[in-house]
A protein has these predicted regions:
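N-terminal amphipathic alpha-helix/helix-capping segment at the start of soluble metabolic enzymes
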Residues: 1-13, 54
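Short, charged, low-hydrophobicity "junction" segments
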Residues: 2-5, 28-36
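Active-site-adjacent beta->alpha loops and helix N-cap segments on the catalytic face
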Residues: 17-21, 25, 37-60, 76-80, ...
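A short acidic, helix-capping loop that chelates divalent metal ions and anchors anionic groups
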Residues: 69-74
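Residue-level signal for inorganic ion chemistry
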Residues: 89
């Protein structure tokens, strides 16, 4: 078995296309694109994602999927919105999505 060293990835949180481009120019391996950073990060707009995907050619693009700030307890309607956002990201060729969800039962 060969000794394979694992490379550390350089990931940058970006709040828009401009930040994505700066991260790519700075050598980032991956960008996590999000809006609403003061709220803890929310899903960016369709246009922001589409343009970021087009502009990033050497850096992987991951998009946060979060319909709002606050807790991570989502209503069924919010989950449906998140599922649609994931489908949109897939159609746009995003490399991955970032999700956090807390189940109510896990709080007990």
């Amino acid at each position: 078995m060969q000794n394979q060293s694992k490379k550390c990835l350089f990931e940058v949180c970006a709040n828009g296309v401009e930040s994505c481009m700066a991260a790519q120019e700075g050598g980032a391996d991956r960008v996590e694109l999000c809006a609403g950073i003061p709220e803890g990060g929310t899903t960016p707009s369709y246009g922001e994602i589409k343009i970021a995907r087009r502009m990033l050619n050497t850096t992987r693009l991951h998009v946060i999927i979060r319909p709002r700030g606050g807790d991570f307890l989502y209503t069924p309607l919010e989950v449906e919105r998140m599922e649609e956002d994931i489908r949109m990201c897939r159609q746009l060729g995003v490399d991955g999505v970032v999700i956090r969800k807390v189940e109510f039962a896990s709080l007990i």
